[in-house]
Swiss-Prot record:
InterPro entries: GTP-CH-I_C/QueF, GTP-CH-I_N, GTP_CycHdrlase_I, GTP_CycHdrlase_I_CS, GTP_CycHdrlase_I_dom. Belongs to the GTP cyclohydrolase I family. Zn(2+) binds at C75, H78, C146. Toroid-shaped homodecamer, composed of two pentamers of five dimers. The gene is folE. Pfam families: GTP_cyclohydroI (PF01227). GO terms for biological process: one-carbon metabolic process; tetrahydrobiopterin biosynthetic process; tetrahydrofolate biosynthetic process. Pathway: Cofactor biosynthesis; 7,8-dihydroneopterin triphosphate biosynthesis; 7,8-dihydroneopterin triphosphate from GTP: step 1/1. The keyword Calcium does not apply. It comes from the Bacteria. It comes from Pseudoalteromonas atlantica (strain T6c / ATCC BAA-1087). Keywords: GTP-binding, Hydrolase, Metal-binding, Nucleotide-binding, One-carbon metabolism, Zinc. This is GTP cyclohydrolase 1. Gene3D superfamilies: 1.10.286.10, 3.30.1130.10. GO terms for molecular function: GTP binding; GTP cyclohydrolase I activity; zinc ion binding.
Amino acid sequence: MSDDLTQHYSQILSILGEDTQRGGLVDTPKRAAKAMQFLTDGYEKNLNDVVNGAIFEADTDEMVVIQNIEYYSLCEHHILPFIGQCHIAYLPQGKVLGLSKFARIVDMYARRLQIQEGLTKQIADAIQEVTGAAGVGVIMEGKHMCMMMRGVQKQNSSMVTSVMLGAMRKSDATRNEFLRLIGK
């Protein structure tokens, strides 16, 4: 795939009128291909491998919150970056997920061509699937380069999406506890 991407990036540069043999551009197609592979390596991962058995028995049913997980992704409409923070809460039912796995789940889905709305849902569904939690909440904040660099060019715009599952959706008190804990 890397050779194909390199060739396509070279063609794109040529179509734009650039000289691909110019000093600063000689290795650009190769670097761009490598960057694109890294930015989309989520396609090569699956939930079971990412979790890697890191589900642990725990005598707790109280809310667990992981906040300010940084992420970056590429929007599926313009292939431009969007970046932000993800906040996750879940209500364990005798099992907890290893802490680093939350960030790994976020990265796995973020490193695919995405929209933030879909990314938020994928993360919530994945956490629900692997933990069997009584409730899951995911809130994502993002700044989208497709809004900032092109089109309407609104530099201070941001987007917030949320998905609430189970008790997080059904109980106002539980949802409000999550929002309070993350300062929203």
